[in-house]
Curated annotation (Swiss-Prot):
Disulfide bonds: none annotated. This is Capsanthin/capsorubin synthase, chromoplastic. GO terms for molecular function: capsanthin synthase activity; capsorubin synthase activity; oxidoreductase activity, acting on paired donors, with incorporation or reduction of molecular oxygen. Catalyzes the conversion of the ubiquitous 5,6-epoxycarotenoids, antheraxanthin and violaxanthin, into capsanthin and capsorubin, respectively. One of its GO terms (cellular component) is chromoplast. It comes from Citrus sinensis. Its main location: plastid. The lineage of its organism: Eukaryota, Viridiplantae, Streptophyta, Embryophyta, Tracheophyta. Its EC number is 5.3.99.8.
Length: 503
């Protein structure tokens, strides 16, 4: 869902998405919303022309006005003549890469180099988070817009009002803060694309497109979902979240300015679109909306999860029909984004010679698409594991280092919890619009401790089991029938995977 949005300066024109790895690969997600490498701002004139038709409304024909921006910041650059051997090389300067660089470089003088084709580019995606998540990790000052409440439209007759504040991340403020801390800690930067990663027993190196080779004890891949540097030994049977979003100036809109719309599952806008309505009944999409003022709003039509992925053209067509039905006339498209987020699937091989964080590490929430806040929160623990090996006099390297850092990110309890979240994703994949509505009707009736914890990946395995029992108790009879008839296969798969993890 698009919890996922995009980087602006701290002006009201910023949006929030949850892909958090490489600068050049945007993404976004609803349960943050937070998505990566999958979401991108589009200004391709040919793309818009290709799908243009008056049936879908004028906004699809409007060209986004945003252009790539760069931070005005002096970085300390890597110089080949220095012949420095680093402790850690981090590939990618998205939120995940810079957060880890900031954290690990502050521990025991660990030497870090970040490599990215454009380290000063503003992040091209938006990030949305629950305010309490950023409060817990000391980053609340990086939010430039907050809403005291969120709401979920189950259908035309039922709306859930959630007393949990939601915020939009200022991409420029967050990136500047991370860069400032990195520079203070002695992190070096290299402007290049990594072509190859090579490994020896106690040392690794990267080869860049400018011909430079840089050596380190540990390589960390934070470059996003599309990376080829991280190995998998199981089929990557992802579900996919796909969305189309626009930051738009509109003549007016119907949203309350003090409420962020987390999900709108209504489908009355498809009454005159029989094909779209029929397909939406099987593979539903919802609207995600962040109203900034009476004329500025971020709007995103999102397929929560599907396999195979829902057509992007279909998503845009549904969005156009929805906005037309709601009477929202778009005057200007300031940004638009296409978001495609792989969800669930197997974890990378653990351990392996390349460490990972962000989209390529499996951190994205399999059932929601959230990732940014979680990555920000987990980076310090991973930094501790790295520093324990490389910042001490012991200098643990090679396979013991890889084992230590991978287990620092994915300890057994976290891997087991992920199996449960993946079970949630597999369940959602089997629900049509009516089943999805029933599910979220019951889900947001749970004790806030449960639904807060589920969306923020905070619950233990025992608590997740308690959530399941409570959800079954809150569910309607029809929803219970969905659970009984559609969940056994995913449940058996989850139990088998849990058994394998604990052996």
């Amino acid at each position: 869902m698009a919890t996922l949005l995009s980087p602006f300066s701290p002006s009201p024109l910023a949006k929030v998405s949850q892909i958090i790895d490489s600068t050049s690969s945007p993404s976004f997600s609803l349960f943050p919303l937070g998505r990566q490498n999958a979401c991108s701002r589009k200004a391709d004139h040919h793309h818009h022309h290709r799908i243009r038709t008056s049936k879908f409304g004028n906004f699809l024909e409007l060209t986004p006005e945003s252009v790539p921006e760069f931070l005005d910041f002096d970085l300390p650059w890597f110089h080949p003549s220095d012949r420095i051997r680093y402790d850690v090389i981090i590939i990618g300067t998205g939120p995940a890469g810079l957060r880890l660089a900031e954290q690990v470089s502050s521990r025991h003088s660990v030497k870090v180099c970040c490599v990215d084709p454009s380290p000063l580019s503003t992040w091209p995606n938006n990030y949305g988070v629950w305010v309490d998540e950023f409060e817990d990790i000391g980053l609340v000052d990086c939010l430039d817009k907050t809403w005291p409440m969120t709401c979920v439209f189950i259908n035309d007759h039922k709306t859930k009002y959630l007393d949990r504040p939601y915020g939009r991340v200022s991409r420029n403020i967050l990136k500047t803060k991370l860069l400032e801390n990195c520079v203070s800690n002695g992190v070096k930067f290299h402007k290049a694309k990594v072509w190859h990663v090579n490994h020896q027993e106690f040392e690794s190196s990267i080869v860049c497109d400018d011909g430079n080779e840089i050596k380190a004890s540990l390589i960390v891949d934070a470059s996003g979902f599309a990376s080829s540097f991280v190995e998998y030994d199981k089929p990557r049977n992802h579900g996919y979240q796909i969305a189309h979003g626009i930051l738009a100036e509109v003549e007016s809109h119907p949203f309350d300015l003090d409420k962020m719309v987390l999900m709108d599952w209504r489908d009355s806008h498809l009454g005159n679109e029989p094909y779209l309505r029929a397909s939406n009944l099987k593979l539903p999409t919802f609207l995600y909306a962040m109203p900034f003022d009476s004329n500025l709003v971020f709007l995103e039509e999102t397929s929560l999860v599907s396999r195979p992925v829902l057509s992007y053209k279909e998503v845009k067509s549904r969005m156009a029909a929805r906005l037309r039905h709601m009477g929202i006339r778009v005057k200007r498209v300031i940004e638009d984004e296409k978001c495609l987020i792989p969800m669930g699937g197997p974890l990378p091989v653990i351990p392996q010679s390349v460490m990972a964080i962000g989209g390529t590490s499996g951190l994205i929430h399999p059932a929601t698409g959230y990732m940014v806040a979680r990555t920000m929160a987990l980076a310090p623990a991973l930094a501790d594991a790295i520093a324990e090996c490389l910042g001490s006099t012991r200098m643990i390297r090679g396979r013991p280092l890889h084992q230590k850092v991978w287990n620092g990110l994915w300890p057994i309890d976290r891997r087991c919890n992920r199996e449960f979240y993946s079970f949630g994703m597999e369940t959602l994949l089997k629900l049509d619009l009516k089943g999805t509505r029933r599910f979220f009707d019951a889900f947001f009736d749970l004790n806030p401790y449960y639904w807060h914890g589920f969306l923020s990946s905070r619950l233990s395995l025992a608590e997740l089991a308690g959530l399941s029992l409570s959800l079954f108790g809150h569910a309607s009879n029809s929803s219970r029938l969905d659970i009984v008839t559609k969940c056994p296969v995913p449940l058996v798969k989850m139990m088998g995977n849990l058994a394998l993890e604990t052996i």
